[in-house]
Amino acid sequence: MAVAFGISAWTRSVAGIGVAAAVALASLLPLSLSGHAAGTYEHANAVNSLGIHLVGVTVWAGGLVAVILCQKLAKGALPAVVGRYSTLAGWAFVAVAMSGIVNASLRIGTPLDLVTTAYGLLLLVKTAILVALGVAGFAHRRILIPGLVRDATRRTAFLRLAVGEVVVMSVAMGVSVALSRSAPPVPQTTIADVDPLASLIGFTFPDPVTPLRMLTAVHPDFLFLGVAAAMAGLYLVAVRRLRRRGDAWSAARTVPWLLGCAMLVYATSGGPAVYGAVHFSTHMIQHMMLMMYVPPLLVLGAPVLLLLRALPARKDGSRGVREWVLAATHSRYSRIVTNPIVAAVVFAGSLVAFYYTPWFEWSLATHQGHMLMTVHFLISGYLFFFVLIGVDPGPKRPPYLIRLMLLLATMAFHAFFGLAIMSGTQILAIDWWHQLGIQTDAQLLADQAAGGGIAWGAGELPVVLVALMVVRQWSGSEQRAATRYDRAAARDDDAEPPRLQRAALGPRRARRRAAEGAVMRRSAGDRAVPVAPDPQPDTDTARPTDRSTAS
């Protein structure tokens, strides 16, 4: 929080204020690691839901207080400010409600507990307050905001309802404090007292792994389940908006995006998530999915391009979602992380930095380490494949030949990493596997070798497919350049436009032709010495041969 205050005091730019707001919200997340969520059954979902709950409440209540305090500064723009806050509050309401449902499901054993325990009664009171606040927000959006647009003098009615909402929110926060200090119906004793193995992974220890169980086992991670559902839903809403407007959007982009969302759900809530902390080989399956399979599918969906086409640009100089996305894609930071060398080093170097440092064991033993691992590999994979096959707007990408060379080098490094894991004799994260105690050291080494083979083999398929996509994009780029050249030549009666000619010939041939032209011009300049005209021969004295030569 102190960092957020420091950033806001140091800069007055819109980007700086946005960074300060993001840092302030991130500072709330450590609070979710305390309270009922710490060390209990379903620890991961409890911590995630509490973190989302805190962020949603802060944005909702804090945003409303900010609108009330700054309403005089808005002047004639108050209707627009309130309308935009209403949209933000709607999303915060959904986040608070959904995270509250998840958290309550972990604390309530049966529906009867809602009316027979003090915890359940407080939960019902909080739910009633949430519904009342939702109704007030609906009134804001349907009645007061249109009234403010028609008549800006109706500010008093808005302030009256807004202050009333703040009072009700304060009551809800008081109930939340009482709820956090009440004993829930489901005992929140540390699960280490019940099942030591379950205490290590945070949920009931699974049965021995089989291929069928890898496909059918489910342990929902509600955070990534909600993220994937929101990504798929918002994408389809944007596509529908484009089509209703008469614009086309290819199914070749929609299908990969939806497949990527589905694969993200499977990697974080299916078999790879259930057995990811139990065996090295199953952990490697989850890792490869998060790093090598989900990101290229999401990149092919072109989400930034879709967003820019679906959302209108603001005309008043303020920043909405579209403006923030544009600012981010063209920022200095974006140019750095999408640099081909940087993206490749982060992508490939993360393998070594993760598995050959304490980070690997930290990701197995702690929830925050696992979350950092998941987010990091998703982002690093997305940036790497964005440089290779992305079509979204952003910093200038390298030529296609450089992309292929970069991909081949990364593929070679990936194969070397897999072979190193397969042939290694040191057990990685050995303390964690010994705590589980379900395999001997010989079995651990064999399983680790299998994981290295998975890293080598599973990583080759997406690399080959991406290489084919790069070649296809390269061929399409050449064909489009040739088509532009032919059209321009036809318009100019088959004359060759120099610029299009250079584009069709390619950069290397264009540079060679330019150099040859410069040499010819210099040579022509050296020969351009004034020479006196040859005297006309005298027809009377000239010999026949001279006469014929002169003619």
Regions found by a protein language model. Give the residues of each.
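Alpha-helical membrane segments of multi-pass proteins
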Residues: 1-551
